[in-house]
Amino acid sequence: MNVLIVLAHPERKSFNGGLVDGAVKQLVGEGHTVEVDDLYAEQFDPVERAEHYPHSDMASDYFYPLNEQRAHYQQNALPQDVQRELARLEWADLVIFQFPLWWHAQPAILKGWFDRVLVYGGRYTSR
């Protein structure tokens, strides 16, 4: 089985990083293929912005992220970092999200990952 572990903690040597290391050791020992996606180490940009879509056909004075995501997904023209993350999701049979709870929620980098990678019109729709 292909396992993707998405780590959202700024310190790789943290308790969360240790949990990832333990999971990798266990999963690899059981014969699985594991890839760790360390959002901080890879400097994933969690902020959705118009600059991610420089070839937009939308009106330049208004940025509507969901429409941009859908249009660029359909044109296979999403930003490179999002395409990389989507390829990882396609590869994975199992995805594990490892993160601390800060103020009763996930870290902002992971929230931004959800916002940018779970592309409207591609990974989900409102229907």
Where in the sequence are the language-model features?
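Short, intrinsically disordered, charge-balanced linker/junction segments flanking boundaries
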Residues: T125-R127
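N-terminal beta1-alpha1-beta2 submodule of the flavodoxin-like/Rossmannoid cofactor-binding fold
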Residues: M1-F99, W103-R123
